[in-house]
Amino acid sequence: MKLHRASHLLFAISVSAVTAGVAAEQFGISSREMPRISVVEPMRPFVMRAAQDIAGDMEKIFGARPEIVTGAAPEQNAIVLAKAGTGWENYAVESMPGNVLKITGSDDRGVMFGLYRFASDCLGVDPFYYWNGCEPKRAASREWKSISIRQGDPSFKFRAWFINDEDSLNGYHPETAGKRTIDYERYQVVFGPEVEEHICETAVRAGFNAIIAASYVDILNPDERKLVDVAVSRGLFQTFHHQEPCGVSGWIAKREWKLRGMQPVTYAEDPEFFHGLWRRYAEAWAKVPGVIWQIGLRGVGDRPYWVKADWHSADGWKSAEVPEEVERERAALISKAMNKQVEIITDALGHRPEHFATQLWLEGAQFFRKGYLKVPEGTCIIYADNSPGLKFGPDAGRQKRFATPAGLYYHLAVVHGNHYTQLVPPRRTHEIFSYMHEKGAKEIVIVNVSNVRPFGFTVTAAGEMMRDLGSFSAADYARRWASLRVGEGRAKGLADAIDAYFGAYELVDSRDDVSSYGAKTPRAKLALFNDGVLYARTDDILCEMEGGATDYVRIPSDIPTDDPDALTDAAKDAWHATTQDMSPYLKSRARSSERAYRQSAAFATVAARLRPYGTEFLHQARFLSIASRLYAAAAAGDWQGALWAARERDALDAEMCLGEEWRRWYDRHLIYPFRTLAARIEKIAELERGKQGKECEK
């Protein structure tokens, strides 16, 4: 039996990182005689789901599906699942005599993660295969000289995905989508349980054990409860956005005010209203296994609790200076609310919650830093980054070591920044995680993954480093990721090209300290390559031309509107560097179902050579390049140039749909709807031509 070269590379690297001097037996898989997957003792349902996943992986590779059996372990030709040892999610994957692979875990999740580790490191299955189309290579058989992988307690106990501002997911497979009941334009629908299945499978394959199943989940809405049930069935703990104490967001409160015919109230004005709402939702969430509770106090649309206006209003952003005594009073009220929430959760559960946390954000972080905010005993304090996933604020930076259980909230994607593109390099993420881990933030990491699909490279890397910070290497990870797509011989070339991609859009100087926002951050560059800011600034210009007011509070930007040439040149240079670095190393292998890029024959050639290996990076580089040109043209009043760029954006979206499966992916881009810009620009261009014609007549 012959070992597939890409899988061998993955296996060799992974095993060398976790074993030293451990002898193990040879193990092989052949389509002629598939090993059975043997579950020798009762396991929770999510372990059986994982076994089915691995059986499916083996069927894709070998053309035959292994049988899953229970009871006594076979002595020959089997993959045996059992529990052994102690610790949190520990596991071992070892080949034994008789062509047996034994996967043991200290608990059920340990067994599950051991299975998925075998799939990724030995079978070569990309955790994001569903989203990126990178399926494992077919083979009649494979053989490993030995397999011995051991994983102790993970570096971070809870490792959570946050599905946030998920406009693409909500438009994907609309036939299975459900209805929401909150008054929020972006969230009139919620993606269906079939989509959640793919999300949760990817999360556990990537090593995550917790999830915020969607933004603003309403557990009492059956369509949203289905998502929670799917996540639980996959072995994922449930947690919440920092706006959702006891599972209640400000949008739920706003709906309740309307249903009851009430005027909006703050917690200070009507605490009993909130107590009743928290109690009602805590009782529902108490029936869900594995909840990491959220406590805290924020207003509608993630505003301070004393602001009644929602996020649509500019008033919601105001942060006026107030006397110290006012800050102390506000902090005391938040502390009082948190203690009440713990009391309500305790009543709902019948015992004090085992896991509960509060996320420090804006005024919460400020009050805590000043010593005004007192949290209930046992609260895990979650510190937040600066949104682009690049630094942590002074509330974390000023502490040598955290005195309480601590964690971090980290953005690999962010709605007012890189919402559709990967811009945070794994190297930087590793620096941030290591910095926080050394201070004692080991309890939980919540990673914002937005719409999931665009972020496979960076999210998979985050999963690996959360498992074992000490052994993670960004360069090694990139090479292994590349080897799945192009093989060992070309892996370094693709890995170098990916490094060049991140370098072209580097947001923070490597000398910057991760502990604070700092003056050295190149703000203009940060604003330049950022899809959220580029859309917002372009939309501002169009609104001014249309004579309307902007309907969204704009993100501040340092891009000079009077120098569009500099913007265009920077985008052009970054795009050129990325494509030039990538193109020489990639095999020419384009699937018949994939369409080439339309901008020019040169781009079409590059795209064909990239697919299906580095397509996401090529797409995201072009996305940023065209968005930059669109803004530059609009700022210069070049409406024909802006129209060309807007149409190119539409074409780029269409090309990335990759067949019937993804044809609806961009249908509900409500947050930054680049697709709507072409029609608006066309009207403006027509008006401008009319004005010019009248001037010529004069």
Regions found by a protein language model. Give the residues of each.
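Substrate-binding cleft of secreted/luminal carbohydrate-active enzymes
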Residues: 425-506
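Bacterial N-terminal signal peptides
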Residues: 8-18
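An acidic-aromatic substrate-binding cleft motif
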Residues: 126-188, 194-214, 404-407
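Gly/Pro-rich turn-and-neighbor structural signature
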Residues: 222-225, 230-233, 264-403, 553, ...
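Catalytic domains of carbohydrate-active enzymes that cleave complex glycans
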Residues: 476-698
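Catalytic domains of carbohydrate-active enzymes, especially glycoside hydrolases
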Residues: 187-216, 223-226, 230, 234-239, ...
